[in-house]
Amino acid sequence: MKIYLKFKSYNKRICKLLQLFKLEHDQNCSMGLLINHNSLELYNRDNVNQKPIKVDFTSKKNHYRCHHFRRKNEVLYRVSGIKNSYFPTILDATAGLGNDAFIFSFLGCKVIMIERHPIVAALLKDGLQRGYQDKKIGHWLQTRLHLIVNDSLKMLEIPILQPDVIYLDPMYPFHHKKSLPKKDMQFFRQLIGHNYDSKKLLEVSRKLAKNRIIVKRPYYAKPLSEDKVNHIVTTRNHRFDIYQPF
């Protein structure tokens, strides 16, 4: 895939990632990847004031959320199916930047992320590699959070993986101006695009998951399926529709 590549400094590890995901320099591309010392960052060349995007599992935001974790306040704990000493294996079929997958892994679940877009996969892989080396979270992150680079539909149609839970967070069209995310995330969504195969993804997921399928939706969005939603958990901005397997 073609993208503008900018090096602040040479990094052998990141150069190997660029080769692995076949990311090649294009002088005319409006999207850029910045090799910023020890991290890989996506940025908008048309708006240099826009904050670059990177996967950082050691961020202050993640640290705060983990440090202040309370079962009743953490919606991902409530929808995950965790109970006593049971920690389900979760397949995140729409990994994105890995934010929710990280929280599931922090809660004690083994999580497999699937991402098909090579640029996003490179960002995730970079974040994982740095996270694995972190002294505070690396010891458990290495055993719980992993990435498969492939198309989710293709992976789910091959019954190799047998997760307890499948988690879906498909991109959804903006409803109105008030629902717009921050500008940096709007830029990221332009890269990913809308998940037109999300209904098919849910259907296939219900044939594979052992215990439940969780679909994260904006609060205003219709359910992804016309079938009955077995359980719903709501927050201020989102709704988590839980389906039973077929």
Curated annotation (Swiss-Prot):
Subcellular location: Cytoplasm
Enzyme Commission number(s) of this protein: 2.1.1.242
Keyword match Protein biosynthesis: no
Catalysed reactions, as listed in the record: guanosine(1516) in 16S rRNA + S-adenosyl-L-methionine = N(2)-methylguanosine(1516) in 16S rRNA + S-adenosyl-L-homocysteine + H(+)
Molecular function GO labels: rRNA (guanine-N2-)-methyltransferase activity
Pfam families referenced in this protein's UniProt entry, alphabetically: SAM_MT
Residues where S-adenosyl-L-methionine binds: 115-116, 169
Chief site of localization: cytoplasm
GO cellular component: cytoplasm
Enzyme class: transferase
Role according to the record: Specifically methylates the guanosine in position 1516 of 16S rRNA.
Similarity section: Belongs to the methyltransferase superfamily. RsmJ family.
This protein's name: Ribosomal RNA small subunit methyltransferase J
Organism: Buchnera aphidicola subsp. Acyrthosiphon pisum (strain APS) (Acyrthosiphon pisum symbiotic bacterium)
